[in-house]
Structure formats: structure tokens, C-alpha cells
UniProtKB/Swiss-Prot annotation:
Gene Ontology terms: cellular component: chloroplast; ribonucleoprotein complex; ribosome
Quaternary structure and partners: Part of the 50S ribosomal subunit.
Organism per entry: Helianthus annuus
Name this polypeptide is given: Large ribosomal subunit protein uL16c
Localization, UniProt: Plastid, Chloroplast
Family (UniProt): Belongs to the universal ribosomal protein uL16 family.
Amino acid sequence: MNYNPKRTRFRKQHRGRMKGISYRGNTICFGKYALQALEPAWITSRQIEAGRRAMTRNARRGGKIWVRIFPDKPVTVRPAETRMGSGKGSPEYWVAVVKPGRILYEMGGVTENIARRAISIAASKMPIRAQFIISG
């Protein structure tokens, strides 16, 4: 899966700041088990995909996985050994802005110990601390 928007209104964005906690996307909606972020961070599309792959490999054919975050923020990088000035760099990769409390992945249709194992492996792929939660 290639996670990036099909088209955006603008090619480049400001960095912004990650203040406070997540008020949207912080409840379990689809599955029974979930991975919840405990720290603010930018999570790249590659990290999201690595976590998803780890979960699917661990759950094998049972269960369903939902990815609740989408990388819609372009991160620009300047070429190496370039002098200051001459505009902003070109978009290099995409990130999802994640605040504490945000649900990253959800899982359903499997037993709790399988879900716990799969989600803990996905959590180790993330650049932040995250916790396993159960709905209800």
C-alpha cells in the first residue's frame, strides 16, 4: 500500500506545532482492540505501512485490521550541501500528525492474546510510546 494523497491543494505546508491532545479519532470505532498513541509525533507513511504489515503477518488469515491515520502532510527536504535561501525544499515524504490519545490501528475478529501480540509488534515499529486498549 502506498500511503499518500491522490492530490492536494498545495504542494508544500508549514510545519505547524503539536499542542495538546487529540480530540478526534481517539475512540475505538471499528474493531475491538486498538493501539493508542501516548506521545505527539509525525508518523511517516513507511512507518504506518511497516506497522500494518507486522500486524497482518502476526494475525495470519484471521481478523480484520483498520488503519485509522493517514499521512496527508508533505515534509520538504533541501538537497545536501545547499546554501541557504533559494526557496523551500521539494516534498520528500508524507507524514500523519499524531497527538496523544489518537487511535493508530484497530483490530477485530481475533482473540485478545493474538491481538495483544500483533499490536505490540506494530507498536515497536512506531517512533512513539503507544498503548494497547480494548473497547467497552
